Amino acid sequence: KNFAGNRLYRVACGPSGADYHWTEVMMQNLTPALTDAIALHFYSVPEWNNKGSATEFDDDAYYSVMDCANEMEQLLKMHTAIMERYDPENKIALVVDEWGTWYDVEPGTHPGYLYQQNTMRDAIVAGLSLNIFNKMTRRLQMANIAQMVNVLQAMALTDGDRMLLTPTYHVFRMYNVHQDALFVPSDYKAGEIVSETGRRCADLSVSTSRDRHGVLHVSIVNPSLAKAKKLTLAFDKLKPASVEGEILATDDIHDHNTFENSELVAPKAFDGAKIKGRNINLTIPAASVIVLEIK
């Protein structure tokens, strides 16, 4: 109940993963007077009984997590389609109340505290996920990574009076240019990466927005461990005058920040995007996240 001029934002317990029947039944019975949103719960975990190490993993384990992370887009599309049938006026939102990676806890830590390290693999998952969320904002109103500090795919890790920022934090900071901006549709026909054991994921992920000053920001993720990807950004009405960017990438996908080396994984300036007429050409290194600012 609302008191003292405050208004509660009420979120109904929604589905876990691909439980579309749950969403169907909920939407048959909910009204905007009862709730503001339904929550979707999904982690990028291929095997719950064998989550694996956060820092020691082979290529197949890497691509299995990418495959799982990419599943988020299909989940959002399917749940949204159900909600559209019952709520075409978009009065009930969809929120992702928990998402992210989940591995075995770090050796020597309490199993109930879910403390795990955070590598470039997690940065790629963060970038892929945020790009997906950007595309779905008509219905999707909130997406909460789990969690902020010292738990699962955290932004920061602490030890006494020491603190470090994780690769996931850096992706979130790079992507903050999309906040309060207007989503700009872009057409990219993604190819597919297929691992030796049949794991699949899109070969590139792209999302674009325009801020209140008219500046375009393009976030790009290349999840391939082995191949750089050439990309041409072609604009119908804009003739770009300048482009600059940041990149998050390292030589080893297992790289992570420690209290002894807290800046091993950190963004750097990216000057590899070149303007040619109405196009911008660039090469996205393997296993990297890039955000461009285009004026």
Residue ranges and their predicted role:
Residues Y9-S16, E56-E73, G112-D122:
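The substrate-binding groove and active-site-proximal loops of carbohydrate-active enzymes
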Residues G17-W22, S44-N49, G100-E106, V149-M155, ...:
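Flexible loop/turn segments at secondary-structure boundaries
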Residues E24-N70, I92-A93, D97-W102, Y115, ...:
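Aromatic- and acid-rich polysaccharide-binding/catalytic face
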Residues I38, H79, E98, A143, ...:
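Conserved, mostly hydrophobic/aromatic
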Residues K91-V206, V215:
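Aromatic/acidic polysaccharide-binding cleft in carbohydrate-active enzymes
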Residues D187-G191, E196-C201, H213, V221-K295:
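C-terminal beta-sandwich/jelly-roll accessory domains of carbohydrate-active enzymes
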